[in-house]
């Protein structure tokens, strides 16, 4: 992700928060719809999961939120 100078983590999170709606997620990210579609393809290849499956999407989003909280806690402790 860092090597490609893109934020695939944030892209996936916004996509999931927008209930897998490409148009709404692209608007939220202020990027072109095709750019989002390309990033989602990269994400699918990296994680090898069906991000459009409702159960998978819920699990991913829950994990991402827990990860974000954990990172915030670590920053506070420093």
Model feature map: region roles:
Residues 1-78:
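Cytosolic nucleotide-utilizing catalytic cores of signal-transduction proteins
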